[in-house]
């Protein structure tokens, strides 16, 4: 698996940490794709679409490498939240999600342009928040950095105290569904070996 270079098309520190956690060797090349979450497709299709766009934008100049693209969104009843642009948007998101159960959806694309191979999938996790108040929202935004996180919160930081329960992959909520990724990553390598007659 180590003979082909891997590129993560994301500068997310959480994705980098998670991929290192499973021993993956990779470089980082941030995609310049700007997501538009107003497309008239389902939330799952939306996450997959932008993951593919990110991976493909990097694979154009890296055909011999495996490029990994990902996009995480928060969905509540087809209200889709990406990363907040500012403090007001962050507060608005957190107010909306208080006391509710929402979905965290991550789309992933694993692209090997040299052989026109691509594995795409998405992972969903249901997250239920307890009720929290305005003061707690303000304090969270003051102490943490929610502006690079879908839905404006990190389950791995101090906001964990407001998480009542989750149903599904924890790592997906952090930003990358490790187990599902590794399954597809291994299968892609198997397909490459079979194509090369190994």
Say what each PLM segment does:
Residues 2-24:
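N-terminal beta1-alpha1 ligand-phosphate binding loop
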Residues 2-6, 42-198:
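Anionic-ligand binding patches
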Residues 10-12, 31, 98:
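Short linear Ser/Thr-Pro motifs
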Residues 15, 35-37, 117:
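Flexible, glycine-rich phosphate/dinucleotide-binding loops
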Residues 17-21, 38, 60-61:
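Short loop/helix-cap segments at secondary-structure boundaries that form the rim of catalytic
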Residues 26-27, 193:
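A local structural micro-motif
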Residues 27-36:
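A short beta-strand-loop structural module common to alpha/beta enzyme folds
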